[in-house]
């Protein structure tokens, strides 16, 4: 059925609503003769009158009532189809703006973006890698659509979409003395050089809270706001470093070891947006993808 034909069907619907060909023509911004002609053409095509013509207007016949019900169903289907087409147009183009913790920047987020762009190659991404405080600030300022951060600070109008409990893990060279163990205690790391994330980062803050309640003292040889630098220190200077498990990627030279839950409690990695905000279609769809992946990672 052509869109032009659907427009002519709307003439019948409008006449039925108005109860008058003249009033319907005024609503449609066409002449009464044009409306009457289209109605008569349809009646001839159907082989039955749609309206009873009366002195003070028109009234639907039984056939007309059936036909108008069909028209309205068709009109609803067309509107849904047009809405879906607009969604697809938005889905296939646009920009997803997201702020994330550093732990997500090396492997997890690039992998998920690549998977999304394999389906929608015209969608672009604007990724901000920040500590959790700054990430939430950019969300509050409408500079990004989504955040994916570890231990997000309180924001009154923040709407979590998905959260995943994360443990802190230790990164070390494959030939480190502790690498032979499947799980370590923080006390095992005492006496070995360590490189830590700076104090603005969520993982470091969690570790600092634990150390403040203990008598453990680490030999801290380097601190940085760059996880890439810390990873380089692990490989080049044989130190131990710490981060959340989702961002800890092993290699032939670098291994990841769990830290006993008795030492460091798990905390939440949270995907979220501003409450009540209608996201651009690409951002909403990407959020759905991330939520599915995070859900699948639950133990």
Regions found by a protein language model. Give the residues of each.
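Short beta-strand-centered segments that line the small-molecule binding cleft or hinge
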Residues: 3, 70, 76, 88, ...
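Secondary-structure junction motif
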Residues: 193-214, 279-288, 294-298
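Beta-alpha-beta core module
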Residues: 156-162, 166, 181, 228-276
């Amino acid at each position: 059925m052509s869109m032009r034909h659907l427009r002519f069907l709307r003439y019948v619907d409008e006449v039925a609503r108005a109860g008058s060909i003249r009033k319907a023509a005024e609503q449609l911004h066409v002449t009464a003769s044009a409306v009457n002609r289209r109605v008569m053409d349809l009646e001839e095509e159907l082989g039955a009158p749609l309206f009873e013509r009366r002195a003070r207007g028109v009234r639907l016949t039984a056939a007309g009532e059936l036909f108008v019900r069909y028209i309205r169903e068709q009109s609803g289907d067309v509107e849904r189809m047009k809405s879906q087409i607009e969604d697809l147009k938005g889905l296939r183009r646009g920009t997803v703006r997201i702020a994330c913790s550093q732990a997500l920047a090396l492997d997890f987020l690039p992998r998920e973006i690549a998977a999304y762009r394999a389906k929608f190659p015209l969608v672009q991404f604007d990724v901000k890698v920040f500590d959790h405080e700054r990430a939430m600030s950019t969300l509050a300022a409408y500079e990004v659509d989504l955040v994916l951060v570890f231990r997000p600070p309180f924001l009154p109008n923040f709407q979590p979409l998905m959260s995943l409990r994360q443990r802190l893990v230790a990164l070390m060279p494959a030939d480190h003395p502790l690498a032979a163990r499947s799980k370590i205690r923080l006390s095992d790391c005492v006496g070995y050089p360590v490189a830590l994330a700076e104090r603005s980062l969520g993982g470091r803050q969690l570790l600092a809270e634990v150390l403040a309640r203990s008598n453990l003292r680490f030999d801290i040889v380097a601190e940085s706001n760059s996880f890439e630098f810390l990873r380089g220190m692990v490989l080049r200077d044989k130190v131990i470093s710490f981060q959340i498990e989702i961002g800890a990627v092993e290699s032939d030279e670098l291994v990841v070891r769990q830290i006993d839950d008795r030492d460091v409690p798990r905390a939440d990695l949270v995907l979220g947006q501003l409450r009540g905000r209608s996201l651009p279609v690409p951002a909403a769809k990407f959020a759905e993808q991330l939520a599915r992946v995070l859900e699948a990672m639950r133990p």
